[in-house]
Swiss-Prot record:
Signal peptide: 1-24
Subcellular location: Secreted
PROSITE patterns: WAP
GO BP of this protein: antibacterial humoral response; innate immune response
Gene Ontology terms, MF aspect: serine-type endopeptidase inhibitor activity
Identification of the protein by name: WAP four-disulfide core domain protein 3
Pfam families: WAP
Length: 231
């Protein structure tokens, strides 16, 4: 009895599968699917396998050698004012027309480049802005004579024309020469002072005030005044 039930169940299952196969065949369309136009291919596995000036880049479905963006000619303009830190471009090729992707402080934006010929009209080129922040000195000792290591608000750099001065007085000059050899004491070597000489300025040893000779009989009071005994 058990075997008869199993045989009947298998027969019913086979009949159901046959009906499903026939129904599916009625909805199937003739013909074969065309091959994929851009099958995923690994045409490179690293930059070293690509020709010069090409890089192994992903396509989203494989990798292929592609040209490296070379950028556009001409120069970026100088930063005129501080900009917000936004990146509106990555390379020159991401900018429209002839615009160039330039760094403006902490911002990257598409701007119209300038030509070196235009800068040459004013007799040379302006130095690039010290951005990002740079530490151009470690202390006053790392700066030239007459300069001081100062904060720029975005790093430190050597700046001249620092107010200062050295002790001593300038000697009396009899001959006046219109030659400027210094501007301030710090322009002179150690032990010298920048002194006027007629219509010029020279580095000369200063005249120091004479030292006060103390008499053994003199005493110094608590208020730093000398007390000299009357004979």
């Amino acid at each position: 009895m058990m075997l008869s039930c199993l045989f009947l169940l298998k027969a019913l299952l086979a009949l159901g599968s046959l009906e499903s196969w026939i129904t599916a065949g009625e909805h199937a369309k003739e013909g074969e699917c065309p091959p994929h136009k851009n099958p995923c291919k690994e045409l490179c596995q690293g930059d070293e396998l690509c020709p010069a000036e090409q890089k192994c880049c992903t396509t989203g479905c494989g990798r292929i050698c592609r040209d490296i963006p070379k950028g556009r000619k001409r120069d970026c303009p100088r930063v005129i004012r501080k900009q917000s830190c936004l990146k509106r471009c990555i390379t020159d090729e991401t900018c429209p027309g002839v615009k160039k992707c330039c760094t403006l402080g902490c911002n990257k934006s598409c701007v119209v480049p300038i030509s070196k010929q235009k800068l040459a009209e004013f007799g040379g080129e302006c130095p690039a802005d010290p951005l990002p922040c740079e530490e151009l000195c470690d202390g006053d000792a790392s700066c030239p004579q007459g300069h001081k290591c100062c904060s720029t608000g975005c790093g430190r750099t050597c700046l001249g024309d620092i107010e200062g001065g050295r002790g001593g007085d300038c000697p009396k000059v009899l001959v006046g020469l219109c030659i400027v050899g210094c501007v301030m004491d710090e322009n002179c070597q150690a032990g010298e002072k920048c002194c006027k000489s007629g219509c010029g300025r020279f580095c000369v040893p200063p005249v120091l005030p004479p030292k006060l000779t103390m008499n053994p009989n003199w005493t110094v009071r608590s208020d730093s005044e000398l007390e000299i005994p009357v004979p």
